[in-house]
Curated annotation (Swiss-Prot):
It comes from Streptococcus equi subsp. zooepidemicus (strain H70). This is Aspartyl/glutamyl-tRNA(Asn/Gln) amidotransferase subunit C. Keywords: ATP-binding, Ligase, Nucleotide-binding, Protein biosynthesis. Disulfide bonds: none annotated. Allows the formation of correctly charged Asn-tRNA(Asn) or Gln-tRNA(Gln) through the transamidation of misacylated Asp-tRNA(Asn) or Glu-tRNA(Gln) in organisms which lack either or both of asparaginyl-tRNA or glutaminyl-tRNA synthetases. The reaction takes place in the presence of glutamine and ATP through an activated phospho-Asp-tRNA(Asn) or phospho-Glu-tRNA(Gln). The gene is gatC.
Amino acid sequence: MKISEEEVRHVAALSKLSFSESETIEFATTLSKIVDMVELLNEVDTTGVAITTTMADKKNIMRADIAETGVDRKFLFQNVPEKENHFIKVPAILDDGGDA
């Protein structure tokens, strides 16, 4: 299955990534090869093979629900470059909402 350069540009825009023209071409080629390889799995005969959902034999491993003392706030804030109202201030990663 061929992944077009336009599809790469569209997904990049949704992801707020920017690629050069050569990178876009390279991604389209590489992604097309990956999809082709995955599509080969459709040709594997799995008749009689039991469905496998996980390889782990353990289920619902939980720790005891014990309250623990948190980190001292003064110690935590020693290396914080910016703080506001007792919170760590970080750069905004979301814009006004847009249509992305």
